[in-house]
Amino acid sequence: MKSAIVALALALALPAAAQSPVVTVKESPRWGSFQVSLSLFSPDIDSEFTNAVHPPYATIFGTGRPLMVQAQFNKSVWITEYGTLDIGVGAGFWEAWGQGYYQGTDGTVIRGGSTSLMIIPVQAQVGYRFEWFYERFNVPLEPYVRGALLDYIWSTSGQSGVSSWTSPLDGVSYRGSGATFGWSATLGLAIVLDAFDTSLSRQMDYDVGINRTLLFFDFTRSSVNDFGSTKSWQLAPSYWAWSAGLQFVF
């Protein structure tokens, strides 16, 4: 009797199971990405004052590295099973505060009022993210490379606004603001956070269209002196600058 009841239950369950649809969840189509990053930054302005007893940048602003904040927006132009090629634009903000000075007749440094140097880095970039490890083996690591053309918009300010100076020799006025061009090359590694919580990843994709979230770390080498002009400051760091941030792929 028990065998007959079990057989009947199985017979009733099989049609229902056969009719149950199998749902396959796929990522939404990719369009591009948005990222934000933080880095410690210090321009190499003093590189042209190698013999100076009091190099101007270090004397005024010190040897610290204030925080630079940057954001980038990318369009994915080529997506394959191996990786993604992106083109995009970016901008950021950086500012250092210090105390102005002038040199007395006896050579001593005399401190003046507070002053600042502000830089707004603007860039156009192209990058490639190698996604094969994650796509093929589910290893949540994506190395990437990026190259960029840079435009650093800068200004120096004192207590009364943007700094200006008139030469006593020829009467020419100089204003403490301008734009300097350059380039950068970046090597980095991104961690695919979706691999650690796939259900949350699918929900974010369904709700807002973000189909991948990356935590990245990279190192950048750059030069910002109007491509070697002797009339321009070197506004890039003298070292490989690190940065870290989040990238949202949508």
Question: Which residue ranges define each predicted feature?
Answer:
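Cleavable N-terminal export/targeting peptides
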Residues: M1-P29
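Short glycine/proline- and aromatic-enriched beta-strand/turn motifs that initiate or cap beta-hairpins
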Residues: A18-W78, F227-A236, Q247
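Short loop/turn motifs that connect adjacent beta-strands in outer-membrane beta-barrel proteins
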Residues: S20-G32, S76-L85, E131-L141, D194-T213
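Hydrophobic, lipid-facing positions within transmembrane beta-strands of outer-membrane proteins
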Residues: G32-F34, R65-A71, I120-V126, P143, ...
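Outer-membrane beta-barrel pore domains and translocons
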Residues: S39-F41, G90-W94, A148-Y152, A190, ...
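Extracellular/periplasm-exposed beta-strand and loop segments of Gram-negative cell-envelope proteins
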Residues: P43-R65, W94-V122, I153-W183, V224-A236
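Gram-negative (and chloroplast) outer-membrane scaffold detector with strong preference
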Residues: V69-Q159
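Predominantly the C-terminal beta-signal and adjacent terminal strand-loop region
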Residues: A190-F250
